[in-house]
């Protein structure tokens, strides 16, 4: 009996005796009986018999009934060596795209033995030279060239043609003018200036805007402060251009002169001096250094920095007073109050008109005007160097002389 039937009987017997209780004793007996019975066991599935596998391998190793299969993807060095030997015995194929230098060399030798063909489009210089020497080379007619001989002949033929119209005959015109000059008297020209009248030297007219200094001429005695006398003389001295004369006051003209803007600002800092420039009743002379001279000709100092120097011991008020006194000292060395009342004429110079006047700082100033060039120059009486006056301006109450220098220096 099969094990399944025994299990069914055991279950059934257990159910009869008791419910839900297994009879382990009967189950054990049934299993023992099952082992004694020759029942055909079913063959197991998915089992690997190693003995069979071992026997197959041994048989294959012995080479009794089976042959080894050839290995794949394995290099056989012996066959490779034999193949190389066989390859060496075969004829090598000819390479492609390679020059056969030997054949090329032989071809060049054969080419040298053959006669060379004549080159095309190349000049034969030897034949050309022989043709030029022999003079046998025919000349061809030039193109696009003017035939001067033919042109000359055509012009000569053209001259024989009829007279041209609307063309003046200059030769006939010249002849007619010459005949007319011999027969007819010339009429007076209109609107023509007679230059000969200007070549003559007429008497000079009296100049305008002249500063009459005749009443200030000295009596010929040496110049001394106490003995100065002003005499009249019917003659005008300095001559000025009308473009340098203005019908306004010094206070108005000074701001218009940009070249002396710095010096003009110094004048405006002192109310008393600025008031004199606005007084039309008093004549004042101003010798004004230009801006360039104030920056370059004072030894890198400012006009308020000399002659007195500021010390650290001074108070702020004392320093301001020193600066103000220095600047006033600089201005007084360039100003002349009541100019008409403080000048004399110097007769020692014959080629120029020269006058002498006293500056506000007590020094004497010479002013001269060259009679030929009409240019002005000035110098201090204790100096030998003349300073050219760059520009001079005259107004109702004084003069402004602009110089590129300074009369007061450190």
Swiss-Prot record:
InterPro entries according to UniProt: Mug57-like (IPR040200)
GO-annotated cellular components: vacuole
Source organism (scientific name): Candida albicans (strain SC5314 / ATCC MYA-2876) (Yeast)
UniProt KW Signal keyword: yes
Superkingdom to which the source organism belongs: Eukaryota
Record key words, sorted: Signal, Vacuole
Protein name: FAS1 domain-containing protein CaO19.3004
Location in or out of the cell: Vacuole
Signal sequence range: 1-18
Domain FAS1, first and last residues per copy: 247-407
Disordered: annotated span: 64-98
UniProt KW Signal keyword: yes
Compositionally biased tracts (Basic and acidic residues): 64-73, 83-96
Main location group: other
């Amino acid at each position: 009996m099969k094990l399944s039937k025994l299990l069914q009987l055991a279950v059934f017997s257990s159910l009869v005796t008791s419910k839900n209780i297994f009879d382990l004793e009967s189950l054990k007996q049934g299993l023992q009986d099952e082992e004694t019975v020759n029942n055909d066991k079913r063959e197991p599935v998915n089992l690997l018999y190693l003995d069979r596998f071992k026997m197959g391998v041994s048989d294959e190793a012995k080479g009794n009934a089976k042959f080894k299969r050839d290995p794949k993807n394995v290099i056989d060095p012996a066959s490779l060596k034999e193949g190389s030997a066989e390859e060496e015995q075969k004829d090598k194929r000819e390479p492609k795209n390679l020059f056969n230098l030997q054949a090329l060399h032989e071809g060049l030798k054969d080419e040298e033995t053959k006669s060379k063909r004549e080159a095309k489009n190349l000049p034969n210089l030897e034949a050309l030279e022989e043709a030029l020497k022999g003079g046998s080379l025919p000349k061809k007619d030039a193109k696009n060239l003017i035939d001067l001989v033919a042109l000359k002949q055509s012009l000569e033929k053209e001259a024989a043609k009829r007279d041209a119209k609307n063309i003046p005959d200059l030769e006939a015109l010249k002849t007619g003018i010459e005949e007319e000059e011999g027969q007819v008297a010339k009429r007076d020209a209109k609107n023509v200036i007679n230059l000969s009248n200007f070549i003559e030297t007429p008497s000079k007219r009296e100049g305008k805007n002249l500063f009459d200094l005749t009443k200030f001429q000295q009596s010929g005695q040496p110049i001394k402060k106490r003995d100065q006398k002003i005499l009249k003389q019917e003659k005008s001295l300095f001559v000025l251009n009308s473009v340098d004369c203005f019908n306004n006051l010094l206070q108005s003209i000074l701001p218009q002169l940009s070249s002396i803007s710095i010096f003009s600002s110094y004048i405006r800092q002192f109310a008393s001096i600025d008031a004199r420039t606005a007084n039309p009743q008093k004549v004042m002379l101003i010798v004004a250094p230009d801006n360039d001279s104030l920056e370059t000709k004072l030894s890198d100092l400012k006009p308020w920095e000399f002659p007195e120097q500021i010390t650290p011991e001074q108070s702020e008020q004392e320093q301001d007073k020193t600066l103000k006194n220095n600047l006033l000292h600089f201005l007084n060395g360039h100003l002349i109050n009541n100019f008409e009342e403080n000048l004399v004429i110097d007769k020692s110079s014959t080629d120029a008109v020269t006058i002498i006047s006293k500056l506000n700082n007590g020094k004497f100033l010479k002013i001269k005007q060259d009679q030929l060039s009409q240019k002005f120059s000035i110098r201090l009486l204790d100096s030998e160097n003349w300073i050219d006056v760059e520009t001079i301006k005259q107004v109702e109450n004084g003069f402004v002389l602009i110089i590129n220098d300074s009369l007061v220096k450190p």
